[in-house]
Regions:
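Helix-coil boundary and interhelical linker segments in multi-pass alpha-helical membrane proteins
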Residues: 1, 42-55, 104-111
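Membrane-interface interhelical linkers
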Residues: 1-7, 11-23, 71-87, 123-140
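Hydrophobic residues within alpha-helical transmembrane segments
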Residues: 4-7, 34, 56-60, 86, ...
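Hydrophobic/small/kink-forming positions within alpha-helical transmembrane segments
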Residues: 6-14, 36-41, 63, 92-96, ...
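Structural motif at transmembrane-helix junctions in multi-pass transporters
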Residues: 15-31, 107-114
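Alpha-helical transmembrane segments of compact multi-pass small-molecule transporters, enriched
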Residues: 31-45, 121-125
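Hydrophobic transmembrane alpha-helices of multi-pass small-molecule transport proteins
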Residues: 41-44, 54-73
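Juxtamembrane helix-loop-helix junctions in multi-pass membrane proteins
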Residues: 97-122
Length: 140
């Protein structure tokens, strides 16, 4: 369970970094904002808990606010919209699942065991990225 959550953390980071590196920030950030709606959706789906209308409205308003705050000049074309939407959206799904699965599985494990294990597995999985580094770690 902690390995799954740690994997979601690493996958979400990779996907959202990809969206920012290859795409347009003004497109990526509003896509990241859908995480709030996805958490509400996965809460009903995975935790089988009802989410009230007030929370759904708040989630949708949050996405709208993030979108409005990240408007760009209409004269500038967006870069790589497809990869931005895909990787940003998948990253948001990973982070939303991370949030919901922490709520679901932590009571059985206890916070003192679950959180350190999540970050241990996240760090362990991150070592798989070392071959893809373009510069030595001391340059970072």
């Amino acid at each position: 369970m902690p390995a799954v959550i740690g994997g979601l953390l690493v996958a979400g980071q990779l996907l959202q970094f990809l969206a920012l590196e290859r795409g347009d920030v003004s497109v990526a950030v509003p896509v990241f904002g859908i995480k709030v709606v996805l958490v509400a959706f996965f809460t009903t789906l995975i935790l089988a808990e009802s989410v009230g209308a007030r929370l759904w409205i708040a989630a949708v308003l949050s996405v709208a606010a993030v979108t409005c705050l990240n408007r760009r000049d209409a004269n500038q074309p967006s870069r790589h919209v497809g990869i931005t939407l895909l990787s940003g959206g998948l990253g948001s799904i990973c982070f939303a699942l991370f949030d919901v699965l922490v709520q679901k599985w932590t009571p059985a494990w206890g916070i003192g065991r679950m959180v350190p294990l999540i970050f241990f597995f996240g760090a362990l999985l991150s070592f798989a990225l070392v071959p893809f580094f373009r510069a030595p770690l001391r340059k970072i």
